[in-house]
Amino acid sequence: MSKNKKNNSFKLDKKQIAIGFFALFVLALIFFLSRTIDFANNEGKSSKEINENSYNSSKIMRVDLDELKSIDFDLNTCDVRIQQSSTNPYVEYTNLYKDDYSYEVKTKYKNGNLKLSSDIKGKELYMKNKIQIVRIFLPKNKEIESIKARLGAGDIKISGLVCKNLDFKLESGNISFEDSKISGSVSNNVGSILIKKSELNNSNLSTKIGNIVVSDTKLLSDEKMETENGDIKIKIPESIKEFNINARLNVGNFVLGDISYRNILDGYMTGKNKKKTLNLKTDVGDILFNQKDENSIKEEEFIKTPSPESNSDSDSNSNSNDENTNKNQENN
C-alpha cells in the first residue's frame, strides 16, 4: 500500500506541475493579447491626435528688401536657407495654419537690418506634413556685416555667404556652409557643423553632440574646433606643417596625415613658430587632420607625458620637436 500511495502522489505531483505550466501559459497569452490590443488602441489614438493637432494649411510669404546689412533671427522650429539672389535681396517664408491656430514668421526691416521671429497664435501644433521654411536671399557679391541666429530645431543651410561677424546658436539640427567666407562663432547642441569649399577666418566651431567636418576649405587664421561627443574631421589643401596644432582628446583616435598618435590625454602641441594656430578638442571622438587612406597609416607615435623636471626645458625643445614633426609630415 505504501508503494502505491507513493506512486499515486508522484503522479499527482506531475499533474499539478502540468496544470501549473498550462495555467501560466494561458495567463501569459492573455497578458500578451491585452497588451497588443491596448498598444493598437493607443497607436490609433496617438495617430488620430497628431492628425487633429497638426497644421493642415500653409501660405508662402515674400518681403522684398532694398539692401541687406545685417540679419537677426530667433525662430522656434523651422528650416532656414540662406543663399545668393540673382536680383535684389528678399526673404521668403512659410506660414502654417489650422482653424484659429497659426505658426507665422514676424518680420521687421529698417535701414538694411532684417529681424525675424516666430509668432505663434494659440498652442503650438505638430508639423506632420507642413514644415515651416525660411529662405533669405542675399545680395550677390556683397558682404553682410553681421548675422545673429537662434534656432530651436531645424536645419540651417548656407551658400554664397560673406560675413565677418557670425553668432549662430542651434539647439537641434545640422548647420552647413558652402562657398562661403565667414568669421565668428557657430555652436550646436545636438547636430553637426559642416563646412565645405569655404574660407574660415578666426572662427569658433563647437558642438555638444555632433561632428565638425571641414573639407576643401582654407583656414586663414587661428581657428578653434571643439566637441564634447563627436568627431573633428579636417581635409584641406593646406599642409599640416603650416599650423601650430594644439589637440586634446580623452577617448578616440588622433591622426595627422598618415601618422596615428596615442596617449595624448595631456595634449599634443607641434610648436609656436607658425603664423596660424589650430585648437582641436573632443572628449569622446576622433580628431582626423588630412588623414590619408586608412591602409597607408603605417606609424604610431606614443606621446610621453613630460616630467616636472623637463618643464623648464619645454621652450627650448619646442623648436626641435617642431622640426621632428615637420619631418614626419613633410609629405602630407
Predicted segments — roles?
Residues 86-96:
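Short Gly/aromatic-enriched secondary-structure transition segments
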